[in-house]
């Protein structure tokens, strides 16, 4: 086995976020408010199942333990179940998760679980059906809620729910969210609104620090949990009176990048060292044959030497990220 992926700042990388499409059928205000528009970048098509098999095999050989399938909306791929199974061929990968808008979850949760999926994250930015419609552009609140129930029925022990925290939209709804998770094994993760190339005006209007919620949670007796090495960036809190948990993802907080453990590959096979970095390193030419695996691992390892110590969001430098559907948020 090749050596564990490590960068110049001694950070080890156990977690791959793999985008398999940038197409999405929702029009969320903070991501694709005008809907999905095909770009020239996808002219060669998205990664095939065989290419996905090869890239995840290389990352598994380099110490990756967790793969999250992202988009766009991953379940729009007709071969999504085959993709899950292909990633699962790697014994070293212990967790295979998906981030989804949930619109196909009620129909497909059981088949995804059977294919090897171990974790589900569902985007839900409001528990009010009308506000959900206003944020997403889709009147699918009840369908998404049914999907979460279906995930539990399919055998998922916990469901993670992602909620983008927005001032004057949902930041004042903490009590509603807490009541929802009190009897349910849901980890509700509030994600600070992040500035993107296309979303600067929205950011200035609606950004609020997660620190506000953290202070309130601590005041109410919530307890901060320790992170595991392949966990994402959320600070997780639990409370003895709640079955559910709260997570806070605060990319503007000091030292957010110090514990970075994840890399990203786009839906067209580019390795991105940071969600808000520049450029990216193409891997696709080395995904065409199994015999290329050693060269692929070398390219990934070499690229990691260029990973910066931190992002530059504080200077409003969003890198190449025009919207969050591009490399999977």
From Swiss-Prot:
GO molecular function annotations of the record: 4 iron, 4 sulfur cluster binding; cyclic pyranopterin monophosphate synthase activity; GTP 3',8'-cyclase activity; GTP binding; metal ion binding; S-adenosyl-L-methionine binding
CDD domains recorded: Radical_SAM, Twitch_MoaA
Cofactor note: Binds 2 [4Fe-4S] clusters. Binds 1 [4Fe-4S] cluster coordinated with 3 cysteines and an exchangeable S-adenosyl-L-methionine and 1 [4Fe-4S] cluster coordinated with 3 cysteines and the GTP-derived substrate.
Signal sequence region: none
SMART domains xrefs: Elp3
Subunit structure: Monomer and homodimer.
Protein name: GTP 3',8-cyclase
Species per Swiss-Prot/TrEMBL record: Salmonella heidelberg (strain SL476)
Underlying gene: moaA
